[in-house]
Structure formats: structure tokens, C-alpha cells
Swiss-Prot record:
Its cofactor is heme c. Residues 1-17 form a transit peptide. Residues 43-150 form the Cytochrome c domain. Keywords: Electron transport, Heme, Iron, Membrane, Metal-binding, Mitochondrion, Mitochondrion inner membrane, Respiratory chain, Transit peptide, Translocase, Transmembrane, Transmembrane helix, Transport. PANTHER family: CYTOCHROME C1, CYTOCHROME C1-2, HEME PROTEIN, MITOCHONDRIAL-LIKE. It catalyses: a quinol + 2 Fe(III)-[cytochrome c](out) = a quinone + 2 Fe(II)-[cytochrome c](out) + 2 H(+)(out). It is a single-pass membrane protein. The keyword Electron transport applies. This is Cytochrome c1-2, heme protein, mitochondrial. Residues 242-260 are mitochondrial matrix. It comes from Solanum tuberosum (Potato). Pfam families: Cytochrom_C1.
Length: 260
């Protein structure tokens, strides 16, 4: 019995050490766009973009997303043009060979919060905030991981010490993350009046980040459904010809009548 208890304790210790090193396994959440024929919740994408703008964009870039990508997905073209015009973009050179600034336009990418990586690390105590353009594809179990990470901040358990400047999060590898808790109830005021709870903001920003990483998902699913339909018709046609046309030829027998 003693050996069995020791073995269980040893296994528990190894499991705890592995969780501390790699982070807890994320639970699975019922994302509305995860079904085979499901599409994005575009109202959630719009709210998620609002969360990104007001909460995340001060530290995290989305260098692969342009303003025009939002047209028809979460905003009208006029809304996106007005949004892009609020930023200043360095352009040029002009006819005199000098750089100049201009209002943003639809073709511009989302602005960078820092001019370079060194500036980003200096502003964040040595930590480098990752680009969020593909974050839900760049992390294992991406959507579930990002949601769990954003909503799982808590006080460290007894016996666990966190270095100053870091914050305890059981889903982050090592359990200590430089990013503080950012989603607090009421942190943003949604335009559509939906209550901005921590869980709601986490769901919405993950929906937005998932769309940013896979903007073609709806088109891909629709194309897959069309191909399945066409191939099903082709299969039925092939089965018909095999059963009623080819089988006659296949079963036909030739008789050789030899005349003496």
C-alpha cells in the first residue's frame, strides 16, 4: 500500500510540475462558428474589434490586417473609411523626396503600437507583446487557449511565488505572465448595449481574432459544401451507369460458332 501511495504521490507531483511548465489544459468552449455549416457571429466580431481597439491595441499589433478587411464583415465602407481617417500614416517620398504624413485609408494596415521590438520590450519590462493577427492559429488549441488565458487571472496558490512585475495565470506556460488582467466588467461600453462582462468581452475578442486569422473560413465551408454536392451527383451518376449500363456489357457473353 505504501508503495502504491508513493507512486500516486509521485505521479501527482510529475503532473503538477508538467502543468506548471506547460500550463493547464484548456477546456473546450462551444464556439458558434465551429460547426461544419456554421458561420461567424458578425455582431460578436464587431464587438471584439471594439475590445481590441480599446483594450489590446495599445500593446499588441495586428500587422496582417487592413482596414478594408473589416468592410462587409463588421462595418460598412463609410464606417471603416472614417475609422481609418482617424490615424496618421507616414508616406512618401513626395515630389521633393521627403516623407509626409496623411490620414489613413482603407488599404492601410492597422497601426503599430511601437516602432520596433526594442521599444516594445522597453515599454513592457522586457516582455514582447506578440502580434495578434494569427494568434488563434499560432497557439495550440488557439481559441480556447486565448479565452482561458484572458479570463483566468487569479491569486497564486499557497506556496507559489510570482516575481514582481509578473502575474499568475495557470494557463500560461510557467504560470507567470507579464500581461496584467485586462478584461474587467465594464471595461468597454458596447455600441449595441450588450453587457460588457469579462466573459462576454473574452468571447467577442476571440471571435474577432479567429476571424482575423481565418477570414476565408465561411467561403471555404461554402465551397466545401458545393464540392460535396457536386461529387455526390457525380457518384450517383456513376452508380447509375455502372448498374444499368456497364453491367450489361460486363455480363455479356460471346459465343463462337465454328462452322465445320
Amino acid at each position: 500500500i505504501g508503495a502504491g501511495v508513493s507512486g500516486l504521490l509521485g505521479f501527482a507531483t510529475v503532473a503538477s510540475a508538467d502543468e506548471a511548465e506547460h500550463g493547464l489544459e484548456c477546456p473546450s468552449y462551444p464556439w458558434p462558428h465551429a460547426g461544419i455549416l456554421s458561420s461567424y457571429d458578425h455582431a460578436s466580431i464587431r464587438r471584439g474589434h471594439q475590445v481590441y481597439q480599446q483594450v489590446c491595441a495599445s500593446c499588441h499589433s495586428m500587422s496582417l490586417v487592413s482596414y478594408r478587411d473589416l468592410v462587409g464583415v463588421a462595418y460598412t465602407e463609410e464606417e471603416v473609411k472614417a475609422m481609418a481617417a482617424e490615424i496618421e500614416v507616414e508616406d512618401g517620398p513626395n515630389d521633393e523626396g521627403e516623407m509626409f504624413t496623411r490620414p489613413g485609408k482603407l488599404s492601410d494596415r492597422f497601426p503599430q503600437p511601437y516602432p520596433n521590438e526594442a521599444a516594445a520590450r522597453f515599454a513592457n519590462g522586457g516582455a514582447y507583446p506578440p502580434d495578434l493577427s494569427l494568434i488563434t492559429k499560432a497557439r495550440h488549441n488557439g481559441q480556447n487557449y486565448v479565452f482561458a488565458l484572458l479570463t483566468a487571472y487569479r491569486d497564486p496558490p499557497a506556496g507559489v511565488s510570482i516575481r514582481e512585475g509578473l502575474h499568475y495565470n495557470p494557463y500560461f506556460p510557467g504560470g507567470a505572465i507579464a500581461m496584467p488582467k485586462m478584461l474587467n466588467d465594464g471595461a468597454v461600453e458596447y455600441e449595441d448595449g450588450v453587457p460588457a462582462t469579462e466573459a462576454q468581452m473574452g468571447k467577442d475578442v476571440v471571435s474577432f481574432l479567429t476571424w482575423a486569422a481565418e477570414p476565408e473560413m465561411e467561403e471555404r465551408k461554402l465551397m466545401g459544401f458545393k464540392w460535396i454536392f457536386v461529387l455526390s451527383l457525380a457518384l450517383l451518376q456513376a452508380a447509375y451507369y455502372r448498374r444499368l449500363r456497364w453491367s450489361v456489357l460486363k455480363s455479356r457473353k460471346l459465343v463462337l460458332d465454328v462452322v465445320n
